Amino acid sequence: MKKYFVLAITMLFCNISQAAVYLIDFKCDQEAYKVFATMTLEELDGEFLEGSKKLARYHDLTTGNGIVIVEADDPTLVIEFANGWSEVCESAIVPVVDDKKAMEILTR
């Protein structure tokens, strides 16, 4: 349900005719990190669907928390990526903007 709410908000507030940036805030259990550790960087990057691109991924290995910054033409691509880890990770997807876009929005 949460995923569909985020998708609806994204479509309302983001210009989905061009690529947008999304922050995935995640918390993974130890099983996820066991799987993650067996993968190559190429395999990890290959998990992002065509039309989406990982900009950055950071981990707090002490808590299992982390973030992924993804650029995507379509928000459903980001949801599909996060869903691939949903058995071992909880995640929240939030559309984000850079300073320039934030200023455009805030000064309207």
Task: Enumerate the language-model features and the residues they cover.
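Positively charged n-region of N-terminal signal peptides that target proteins for export
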Residues: 1-4
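Conserved, structured core segments of small domains
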Residues: 19-108
